[in-house]
């Protein structure tokens, strides 16, 4: 048995908080009976309707790889009315992101219809590998010779797994950065602290999933068998 609001959220209909509001508003039925209490426990074998629509994907957590373009923020609602990732995903059911990428970053963003699946991926104990390719202006030796392990910046400790120089020319350098637990704007802050200005940041891998040949704005769904093995 599970909380009704949780089942609705995991089916990708809306957030758990919004599901609770729909229940209180009388918009949810279980086996034809209107339910008004968000704390009601139900079984996934029950027929659940939300605003007259039967939920039919309760049993199936789904996962997509999305190439997030630069210029979109990873949120459902933005008080500044900036363009969001989810406004562009008109071909998908309601999904949530696993982690996020900031406005000026691009690359692999995992999307799912399951809150439980998202939490499993995001737990620090999961130790999922995140790989980024970063272009920056400045001298690479400053960063590469620095002790970036357990680096404290403005009272926050950062601990990237590795930073490797890929190539450089007279104007900029490309690096590969590997994280196992990302913090807000971690890469940009470490590079800035070492005198480098990041002007391109692309996530190419999250866990076992890679961006492959996707172009900005493209997405693909992960096969269920692959998902079960991760």
UniProtKB/Swiss-Prot annotation:
Keyword RNA-binding: yes
Gene3D superfamilies (alphabetical): Alpha-L RNA-binding motif, Pseudouridine synthase I, catalytic domain, N-terminal subdomain, RNA-binding S4 domain
Domain S4 RNA-binding: 2-69
UniProt GO MF annotations: RNA binding; rRNA pseudouridine synthase activity
GO biological process: enzyme-directed rRNA pseudouridine synthesis
Domain of life: Bacteria
Enzyme class: isomerase
Swiss-Prot/TrEMBL catalytic activity: a uridine in RNA = a pseudouridine in RNA
Record EC number: 5.4.99.-
Active site positions, chain numbering: 102 (nucleophile)
Keywords tagged on the record: Isomerase, RNA-binding
One Pfam family this sequence matches: S4
Database matches in PANTHER family: PSEUDOURIDINE SYNTHASE FAMILY PROTEIN-RELATED, RIBOSOMAL LARGE SUBUNIT PSEUDOURIDINE SYNTHASE B
Family, as annotated: Belongs to the pseudouridine synthase RsuA family.
Protein name (database record): Uncharacterized RNA pseudouridine synthase RC0807
């Amino acid at each position: 048995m599970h909380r009704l609001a949780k089942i609705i959220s995991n089916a990708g209909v809306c957030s758990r908080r919004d599901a609770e509001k729909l229940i209180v508003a009388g918009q949810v039925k279980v086996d034809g009976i209107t339910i008004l209490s968000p704390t009601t426990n139900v079984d996934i074998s029950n027929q659940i309707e939300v605003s007259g629509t039967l939920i039919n994907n309760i049993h199936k957590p789904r996962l997509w790889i999305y190439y997030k373009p630069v210029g979109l923020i990873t949120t459902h609602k933005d008080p500044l009315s900036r363009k969001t990732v989810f406004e562009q995903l008109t071909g998908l059911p309601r999904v949530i992101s696993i982690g996020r990428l900031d406005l000026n970053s691009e690359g692999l963003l995992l999307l799912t219809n399951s809150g439980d699946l998202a939490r499993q991926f995001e737990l620090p104990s999961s130790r999922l590998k995140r790989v980024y390719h970063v272009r920056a202006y400045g001298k690479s030796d400053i960063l590469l010779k620095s002790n970036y392990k357990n680096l404290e910046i403005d009272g926050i400790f950062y601990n990237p797994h590795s930073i490797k120089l890929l190539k450089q020319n007279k104007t900029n350098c490309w690096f590969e950065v590997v994280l196992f637990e990302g913090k807000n704007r971690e890469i940009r802050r470490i590079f800035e602290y070492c005198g480098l200005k990041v002007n391109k940041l692309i996530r190419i891998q999250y866990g076992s999933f890679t961006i492959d040949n996707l172009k900005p704005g493209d997405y693909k769904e992960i096969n269920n068998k692959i998902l079960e093995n991760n």
